[in-house]
Design a protein with these regions (language model features):
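Amphipathic alpha-helical and helix-coil boundary elements used as assembly
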Residues: 1-168
Length: 168
């Protein structure tokens, strides 16, 4: 008897196990939730899990920031939407902007624009109960895969190692 009010905009976590060993954890907030078919002893539900950063796509703004660096402006945007799990891993100092305008764009679009102008990228670190947004100006600081994952589009058969079969 789950309702959307109980689930939407709440923290959720997807844990992936292989041979009873935790191999990955994905933490986020529920953006979409639907109830599917109900059977004799079960009900199917579907949900969309997104990073908390997606909250910034829900608000449009027009405003001016004065005498702030891009990390300071990004911090303001995140804190306004209740996002406190973030960090900056920068190799250089960002210049203070005398004047910075957000005009009729979502907070997320504004964040993306400022990050691109400053040469910043972001990634997420998923831990139990939270995900942390990390801004960086150096690609070598981004998380790396332990080993390559093969891409296999052929259906059927049994492959002993993990692989990617489709991208969307």
């Amino acid at each position: 008897n789950l309702t959307p009010e109980m689930v939407v905009d709440k923290v959720a976590e997807l844990t992936l196990y292989r041979d009873d060993i935790l191999v990955q954890r994905v933490n986020g907030i529920v953006r979409r939730f639907t109830q599917g078919d109900t059977g004799h002893h079960h009900t199917f539900y579907s949900l969309t899990l997104v990073p908390a950063l997606e909250r910034l796509s829900l608000r449009h703004n027009s405003r001016i920031f004065q005498l702030n660096t891009v990390p300071e402006i990004l911090s303001i945007l995140l804190q306004e939407m209740g996002i406190n799990d973030y960090a900056f891993a920068l190799t250089r100092d960002c210049a203070q902007r005398e004047f910075c305008v957000q005009y009729r764009e979502t907070d997320l679009d504004f964040l993306h624009r400022l990050a691109a102008e400053e040469g910043l990228v972001y990634s997420f670190i998923h831990e139990e109960g939270k995900h942390t947004l990390i801004f960086s100006d150096a690609s070598d600081s981004l998380p790396k895969l332990g080993e390559p994952i093969p891409y296999n589009t052929l259906a059927g058969g049994m492959i002993e190692s993990p692989y990617i079969s489709a991208l969307s």
